[in-house]
Curated annotation (Swiss-Prot):
Predominant location: membrane
UniProtKB keywords: Cell membrane, Lipoprotein, Membrane, Palmitate, Signal
Lipidation residue positions, type S-diacylglycerol cysteine: 22
Official protein name in the record: Uncharacterized lipoprotein MPN_084
Statement: the UniProt record of this protein carries the keyword Signal: yes
Lineage per the UniProt record: Bacteria, Bacillati, Mycoplasmatota, Mycoplasmoidales, Mycoplasmoidaceae
Top-rank taxon, per record: Bacteria
Species: Mycoplasma pneumoniae (strain ATCC 29342 / M129 / Subtype 1)
Keyword Hydrolase set for record: no
Location(s) in or outside the cell: Cell membrane
N-palmitoyl cysteine lipid attachment residues: 22
S-S bridge residues: none
Amino acid sequence: MLLRSVWYKLGSLLIILPLTGCGYVRLKRANFQTDFTINRIPTQGDVYHDNYDLTFSLNFATSSKDSYGTGWLIDWKGDENKPSNTDPFLIYLATNLHVVDALRNPQDYEPYNKDSNGQDYGNRDITHFFALGKYTDPGLLGVETKEQSAFISIQTSAIPKTAYTANDFVDYQYDSLTKQWNKKSDQKDQTQEQTVIGQSWSYKPAYADFAVIEVPLFLDNVRDKQVFDYFVKPAIETYKKLGDTAQLFTEQNLKELEKETYIMLGYPVVESNIYAHILGQGKELRVTQQVNNQPVKKNYVLQTITKEQHTLDITREIPTLIQNKSLSGDFVGSKLLSQEEQQQEHAFLGNLNQGIIDFARLSNFNLQYHNREYQQYGKGLALANTNFSGGSSGTLVLNQQKQISGVYFGVLEFGGTNGTNRESSIGVGQILRVKDDAQLQQHSHNNLLSQLGSSHNSITYDIIFGNKDTKNYYAQFAKKHQTHLYSQISSSNQQELKYVDNDPNLKIKEEAAKSTVQNLTVYS
């Protein structure tokens, strides 16, 4: 069998912002040609309706670059029924790590206020614009148009912060020279043992393609209030309807994952002849923010730059609502790649079972986040016939029981004999919680296949609630900031969700922080 090297094409999209003059003509865009269902808002009772409520398009921009991805509600802080008049209502949106590489905020939480090397961001790299988008009824938001549905982008009043990134989340790092994973704790003196390749060390920390951003909504701001009323409240209602935190995040074994059908809905950026409208932070809104002297707003970067409507009108590619459902009705949802389909592609996916990828055994799965190289780790889903286009990175992957199985991040490419890569129809997702499973230990390694990657098999991990093998997970942030997700953990009887309350490493950090506060001397 011919073995092909495997790469992946990320599903986020980067656009160079066009320079525009005063005069312009709105482009006539072609209709996006695809077998998937597009630009159709799911009705109540539709299997895609829950994905629709939870999901948004994300848009980050610097002074020269525009980046798009897809995100979904994972958590929040505040009472949605009686929101505060002074403190912002905080929403937490999950997406991919490679999507939030576009978020570079000097007022972010540490260590995200600098790059991964501890250096200040360059002026051209700083995020100056952020907006949330959704394909919806424009009339709900006061947009005057004859269109019954449109892509509506709303600029929030402040630049988001980073709540969590799944980089360096396990005690393993990858040696680019030997193509093997090593335990970091086994390295006595990493600075001496690492080898320099070009300008970087041979060792790369592990990452999972998952991250969470914090978006503050100041409800005295018209645009933030629109986001809260028309985007966030329906998402919270659906989140709770699906069972809230305790029921929403699945932890299935690999055999159970193989049998699932996965429901996905996202926002790829493609040429699509739909109406698109932006609701920006106009001059009158920005002035209101500046004269409103709320101290809490000093903790955030308020947006002072906006996109004008003509920026969208002359843009050929627009975020477009897509479902992994065929127009003909031949299929609804995605199945994992079968062994037969994998053999037809002559592709080694480092898999343990049908359609399950082990990223630790594939050397081409790596990325740069905030100017540092990372190597992908953990388990993934190889989704047959799910090649969503750029902009769909971060799409939520729900199983048939309406539980969160993972997050979509790209499309597989295979290296051909002539040196060119061929894009496949296979989508890829990162599994968020990997159950302790005998199948992980039973897998036997093939020496022939090891030429394409490491012989190491990924360990169990849980990047939502944590476990003994996961040193960096989202519940740590949720506990520190007392979010809704942590309140659900506290009230739950499920012990597997409560690891954060018994994490020995976290307890050491908390005790050290208390000791530091107690030993502080105050000088008058």
